[in-house]
Amino acid sequence: LHFSAFHFLNTNFNSASSNPNFIGYTAAAGYRNQYRTVPVNYNTASINVNKHGKLKFLNYNLGIQFNSDKAGDVSYSRTEFFIPAAIHYKLLSNNFISFGLSPGIKSFSVDQTKMTFDEQYQNGTYSNVNINGENFSRLSVYIPSSLISLNYTLSKIGKFRNIQLGISRMILLDKNKEWVKNSIPSFNRLNNFLLSIDYILNENNFLRINSLFQKQKVQSNLINGISYIHVLNRNQGITKAIGIGLFYRQKDAIIIQPSFMFDNYELAVSYDVNSNKFKNATNLRGAFEICIRYKLNTFFERLPLKKSCPVFI
């Protein structure tokens, strides 16, 4: 997934990281278009629906998750469908240990009709007949996979609240399928390490600090962020709040994200700029994102326990 999925929904990468105190239903949708950063479009979309319930000795969540990426002039697509589930065991002092499992399937595909090769240009003239390019044994591949997650939530240490430490691994159950002829694509295990902390400034103001580290064979990503959230009003169970977040993906992108929360609705928009291109970039180099989340049948004891869209990038 594109790293924009991190701040859309943290359960994209750790199904056990949902708020263990939350009871009710959630629905979320996010969309990203990188129309200015690169010459071709790069679109990312996510949809998530979850049921959060309570049993005698534990809390749980169960839902469906759909993610889709499409990029480039060949419409290279990556699609994921998962059934995220987690159980949350309550320990002393309202602390939780959580276990998550997200079985699902990934698909990868290209549109060969949109490919062009050097052989199609002869004497300055283009022909769609002379094709001697790559030979695909298939244009798509489907791979079953599963995300295994472990998360520990510490409710309070001094002014720190909702401290989450998480680890997860994405396992591809059949990674040896041939896609390009005589070549097996490298689908390696993806490990995620997650840290999230709320720091209470006063009754109506707090900071949310996040860090996510990804490791896939020799490749790695480090993403750090901090958000300031101000509660505008708490009146008869209706909460209004605004926030501003600043996030940085190591050696790659800087993201600015304002957000607004009203009762059960959360809305976040963001704009990112490729930091490694700052010297040559114009003001138009970046990508626009929008995230909407809705919660139903909920009761929040306090805002910092409530997970919101601008948590992760």
Can you describe what each PLM-predicted range is?
Residues 1-313:
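Subset of outer-membrane beta-barrel
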